[in-house]
Design a protein with these regions (language model features):
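Structural signal for well-ordered, non-membrane alpha-helices
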Residues: 12-22, 49-57, 96-110, 149, ...
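Short, helix-capping/interhelical loops that line the mouth of catalytic, cofactor-
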Residues: 1-5, 51-101, 163-170
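Helix-loop segments that flank and shape redox-cofactor active sites
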Residues: 13-38, 58, 62-67, 108-133
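Serine/threonine-rich low-complexity intrinsically disordered regions
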Residues: 3-6, 26, 66-71, 77, ...
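Alpha-helical scaffold segments that form or flank carboxylate-/histidine-based iron centers
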Residues: 1-9, 26-48, 78-94, 121-148
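Residue-identity detector for glutamine
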Residues: 40, 73, 98, 133, ...
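A hydrophobic membrane-anchoring alpha-helix module
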Residues: 140-166
Length: 170
C-alpha cells in the first residue's frame, strides 16, 4: 500500500499558500512575465488532478490509460475551469476534494501491481517535454507530492507582495 501522507501534506501546503495569496488583499496579484496568475495556477492543478484521478481509476478497472498534461496548460481550458469552478474559492474547494479522492484512491485502494502499472505519459512544462515514455502509476502520484504541488506552491507564494512579510511582522 502506498503511503499518501506526503501527498496530503503537499496538498495542504498548496491550499494554505493559495489561501494566503487570496487573503493578501491584492485581488489579482500580478504574475511575473510569462507566468500564470493564482487562479490559472489553481486551474492547472485541478486539471492535473483530474487527469491523475482518471489514470488511477483506469488502473483500478484494468482499463488502458494514458497521461497527458497538455490540456492543463491550455489558456482557454484554464479560463473555462476557473469559470466553471466559480473562481478562486471554488478552485480551492475543487482541489481539496480532488486531494481527498487521490489520497483515498492512491493509498489503500490500489494493490502494488496496480501501482506498478505502466502508463504512457507525456508531460510538458513551459513548452518543453519533461517525460515522453511509460511511467509507473505510482510515479505519477509521487510526482505530484514531490515536484508538481511543491512547485506550484512556490509559484503561488511568489505572487505575494514583497513587503508582505514586513507588514505581517510590524
Amino acid at each position: 500500500m502506498m503511503d499518501t501522507a506526503p501527498l496530503r501534506d503537499a496538498y495542504r501546503a498548496l491550499l494554505n499558500a493559495a489561501a494566503t495569496v487570496a487573503e493578501s488583499g491584492d485581488t489579482s496579484p500580478a504574475p511575473p512575465a510569462g507566468e500564470w496568475n493564482a487562479d490559472q495556477i489553481l486551474a492547472h492543478v485541478a486539471l492535473v488532478n483530474a487527469a491523475t484521478i482518471t489514470a488511477v481509476s483506469s488502473a483500478a478497472t484494468g482499463a488502458t490509460t494514458t497521461y497527458d498534461n497538455r490540456t492543463a496548460q491550455d489558456t482557454w481550458t484554464l479560463g473555462r475551469v476557473i469559470a466553471l469552478s466559480g473562481g478562486n474559492a471554488g478552485l480551492r474547494d475543487r482541489i481539496r476534494l480532488q486531494a481527498d479522492a487521490l489520497c483515498a484512491l492512491g493509498g489503500p485502494m490500489l494493490s502494488e501491481t496496480e501501482l506498478d502499472t505502466l502508463v504512457p505519459a507525456l508531460l510538458l512544462s513551459n513548452g518543453k517535454v519533461l517525460v515522453d515514455q511509460p511511467v509507473p502509476l505510482r510515479d505519477l502520484i509521487t510526482g505530484l507530492a514531490e515536484v508538481e504541488l511543491p512547485g506550484h506552491t512556490q509559484q503561488l507564494l511568489a505572487l505575494l507582495p514583497e513587503d508582505r512579510g514586513t507588514r505581517a511582522t510590524t
